[in-house]
From Swiss-Prot:
Gene3D superfamilies the UniProt entry points to: 2.60.120.200, 6.20.200.20, Complement Module, domain 1 (2.10.70.10), Laminin (2.10.25.10)
Encoding gene, per UniProt annotation: NELL2
Protein name (record): Protein kinase C-binding protein NELL2
GO BP, one annotated term: fertilization
Assembly information from the UniProt record: Homotrimer. Binds to PRKCB. Interacts with NICOL1; this interaction triggers epididymal differentiation. Interacts (via the EGF domains) with ROBO3 (via Fibronectin type-III 1 domain) with a 3:3 stoichiometry; this interaction promotes oligomerization of ROBO3 resulting in the repulsion of commissural axons in the midline.
Length: 816
């Protein structure tokens, strides 16, 4: 109900906008004949009178030709057409009777993105295209276009909606897979042929146009209805709603995360800090660490060597080191007995009687220090040492470092006989003359290392280390030698590649019969593997089920080889790669579509009126057929009813729409068969009996350009049945059994879809907006919409036919 209201509203809002004037905006128009600049010098075509005199018309002759847009012209076409879902193909034509040819073709390599074809052999118009899932599709419209008469044809494509008008009459309207116009570079545009060798259109074409606009058929038939928006317009509205829903869901999720973060941020003050030796410093804060000036920048400590000042000291003071500081500062001095002492320094003086007196520099004066007595020593007098700064002797080997010293980080205290001194650790150098502060020596930068060739020097605190270059292994702490990755099996070569050791590395080369860069080698099969086969070894193909042969070129006929046993009411029909059981004439499927044909049941021809009994007979239904019986006592004519007309008993006639089939009436039954071909008869109809055509000009070249077929030969190519008829190749889709199920899938390398019960496995998505999904955030999602599951980064969900289908993207996980 909601979808119908939405559509009516959309028609009211946008319907009037679709009623344009009959003039076409040139930016939306591709006038093919004008842009290709066809003329008298163009081989294979010539200008002739058309349906009207307003534009030029050209006769496409049965001669070799190459009507192909130049690269620049084709790209101009594709710039207007690329990634558009609303366009119309228009053409006025007069096609030669029985000709099968391509009107226009847009293809890249073997991929037909858009090709319009008319088959006079089978009396049908075909549209070949690729869908958004990159699968090839063919829509067949039964219609006699190749009748040597003028026709106006328009094919309007609007998203998944096709409308075919012929002579301003709507002939067909279908819902299909949405065609893709994501045309890659190198795509080609052909007119009147598929390529240089195939699909030659024979006849006259006029007014060949592509209109990239809604309801483009109006340009050809102005009186047609155009008051309501197109399917693409409606799909666009639905898409916008889905996009808005997705934006709303993402915005709500972002808002929820932002609120959570704000709640956490309200509880704390976040600032980048630095921590050094147990002390935390704020951003941009600077401090002195020994002889380094350090700063906290963006949470990282950056230090530089401190540059000490050299101040002028006042009278009775001089520069001296101060405990805990790197640079010298002005310090008071004392002059005593011709020597200079700094504040706090002590000195002993011995009298002539040997009495020791201790002095200390205080307030620029040497003052007497009272003696507090000395501890008893436990060493002989010969091992006792007299000190210059104390009246108390110590034993030899006394630990002066245990008392007090000024040796900082990376400097160690060493005991001398009468005092302690500082010494830099190995690998460090002094920052001042007393060795109290030291810094690391970068042996690598200064060339003071022993690393040899094939190594790289890496500085470490107080030392260095030599690491091996890539492709080398260690001999000792300073040397490395070449590493043969091939012998040690430490290479990345493919199992089908040969490893060759090189200096510092190795090379990988694919073995004969394989191709690739060495790290990845794939088997190479000279003739290729057809029908989905995989090349698994040099010139060895692994064929999919249903095919055999060196190149998987031969279809296995399951029907004739006895692999299949169909029900007695069904015939086995072989298809490329597989088969199916099709109900015999007189039977139809009951809707269960049993694979073996058990679901075939009798058709009551009498009850349904599908019989040929004349009015003077009575129809009796039989299993798989019927009987025309004459009532007792009456003299029946044995006439037949065919296509609403009376055919007399014994009468023979040719079908109106199939000149190659002959029918006869025999006692109320109509029996039809193909014409018997007598190749000895000089008047034999070569159209019906192509096998009787010996002319070389009637032969056909296979699409691969290698195989030559005689007229009448048939073959299968890319899920199409192809036939050579008097030099023309005509291909049509292989018949597939009906798939009466909600969900279907087209397996890879197969031609016909199969039913599946899991909607997430289905290939196609029905664009029914009434089938919605409710996601994990309680947001309504339309069929076809996709989203990233809330709380995840790599789980992609999609609404398919009202079901939520989710999968994890492996590439996304690798990028995290």
């Amino acid at each position: 109900m909601e979808s119908r209201v939405l559509l009516r509203t959309f028609c009211l809002i946008f319907g009037l906008g679709a009623v344009w004037g009959l003039g076409v905006d040139p930016s939306l128009q591709i006038d093919v004949l004008t842009e290709l600049e066809l003329g008298e010098s163009t081989t294979g075509v010539r200008q002739v009178p058309g349906l009207h005199n307003g534009t030029k018309a050209f006769l496409f002759q049965d001669t070799p030709r190459s009507i192909k847009a130049s690269t620049a012209t084709a790209e101009q076409f594709f710039q207007k057409l690329r990634n558009k879902h609303e366009f119309t193909i228009l053409v006025t034509l007069k096609q030669t009777h029985l000709n099968s040819g391509v009107i226009l073709s847009i293809h890249h390599l073997d991929h037909r993105y858009l090709e319009l074809e008319s088959s006079g052999h089978r009396n049908e118009v075909r549209l070949h295209y690729r869908s958004g899932s990159h699968r090839p599709h063919t829509e067949v419209f039964p219609y006699i276009l190749a009748d040597d008469k003028w026709h106006k044809l328009s094919l309007a494509i609007s998203a998944s909606h096709l409308i075919l008008h012929i002579d301003c009459n709507k002939i067909y309207e279908r819902v299909v897979e949405k065609p893709s116009t994501d045309l890659p570079l190198g795509t080609t545009f052909w007119l009147g042929q598929r390529n240089n060798a195939h699909g030659y259109f024979k006849g006259i074409m006029q007014d060949v146009q592509l209109l990239v606009m809604p309801q483009g058929f109006i340009a050809q038939c102005p009186d047609l209805n155009r008051t309501c928006p197109t399917c693409n317009d409606f799909h666009g509205l639905v898409q916008k709603i889905m996009e808005l829903q997705d934006i709303l869901a993402k915005t709500s999720a972002k808002l929820s995360r932002a609120e959570q973060r704000m709640n956490r941020l309200d509880q704390c003050y976040c600032e980048r800090t630095c921590t050094m030796k147990g002390t935390t410093y704020r951003e941009f804060e600077s401090w002195i660490d020994g002889c380094k000036n350090c700063t906290c920048l963006n949470g990282t400590i950056q230090c530089e060597t401190l540059i000490c000042p050299n101040p002028d000291c006042p009278l009775k003071s001089a520069l001296a080191y101060v405990d805990g500081k790197c640079c010298k500062e002005c310090k008071s001095i004392c002059q005593f007995q011709g020597r200079t002492y700094f504040e706090g320094e002590r000195n002993t003086v011995y009298s002539s009687s040997g009495v020791c007196v201790l002095y200390e520099c205080k307030d620029q004066t040497m003052k007497l220090v009272e003696s507090s007595g000395c501890p008893a020593l436990d060493c002989p007098e010969s091992h006792q040492i007299t000190l210059s700064h104390s009246c108390c002797k110590v034993c030899k080997g006394y630990d002066f470092c245990s008392e007090r010293h000024n040796c900082m980080e990376n400097s160690i205290c060493r005991n001398l006989n009468d005092r302690a001194v500082c010494s830099c650790r190995d690998g460090f150098r002094a920052l001042r003359e007393d060795n109290a502060y030291c810094e690391d020596i970068d042996e690598c930068a200064e060339g003071r290392h022993y690393c040899r060739e094939n190594t790289m020097c890496v500085n470490t605190p107080g030392s260095f280390m030599c690491i091996c270059k890539t492709g080398y292994i260690r001999i000792d702490d300073y040397s490395c030698t070449e590493h043969d990755e091939c012998i040690t099996n430490q290479h990345n070569c493919d199992e089908n590649a040969l490893c060759f050791n090189t200096v510092g590395g190795h090379n990988c080369v694919c073995k004969p019969g394989y191709t690739g860069n060495g790290t990845t080698c794939k088997a190479f099969c000279k003739d290729g593997c057809r029908n989905g086969g995989a090349c698994i070894a040099a010139n060895v193909c692994a064929c999919p089920q249903g095919f055999t042969g060196p190149s998987c070129e031969t279809d296995i006929d399951e029907c004739s080889d006895g692999f299949v046993q169909c029900d007695s009411r069904a015939n086995c029909i072989n298809l490329p790669g597989w088969y199916h059981c099709e109900c015999r004439d007189g039977y139809h499927d009951n809707g269960m579509f049993s694979p073996s044909g058990e679901s075939c049941e009798d058709i009551d021809e009498c009850g349904t009126g599908r019989h040929s009994c004349a009015n003077d007979t009575i129809c009796f239904n039989l299993d798989g057929g019927y009987d025309c019986r004459c009532p007792h006592g009456k003299n029946c004519t044995g006439d037949c009813i065919h296509d609403g007309k009376v055919k007399h008993n014994g009468q023979i006639w040719v079908l109106e729409n199939d000149r190659c089939s002959v029918c006869s009436c025999q006692n109320g039954f109509v029996m039809c068969r193909r014409m018997v071909c007598d190749c000895e008869n000089p008047t034999v109809d070569l159209f019906c009996c192509p096998e009787c055509d010996p002319r070389l000009s009637s032969q056909c070249l296979h699409q691969n350009g290698e195989t030559l077929y005689n007229s009448g030969d048939t073959w299968v190519q890319n899920c199409q049945q192809c036939r050579c008829l008097q030099g023309e190749v005509d291909c049509w889709p292989l018949p597939c059994p009906d798939v009466e199920c909600e969900f279907s899938i087209l397996p890879e390398n197969e031609c016909c879809p199969r039913c599946v019960t899991d909607p997430c496995q289905a290939d196609t998505i029905r664009n029914d907006i009434t089938k919605t999904c409710l996601d994990e955030m309680n947001v309504v999602r339309f069929t076809g919409s996709s989203w990233i599951k809330h709380g995840t980064e790599c789980t992609l969900c999609q609404c398919k036919n009202g079901h939520i289908c989710c999968s994890v993207d492996p590439q996304c996980l690798q990028e995290l």
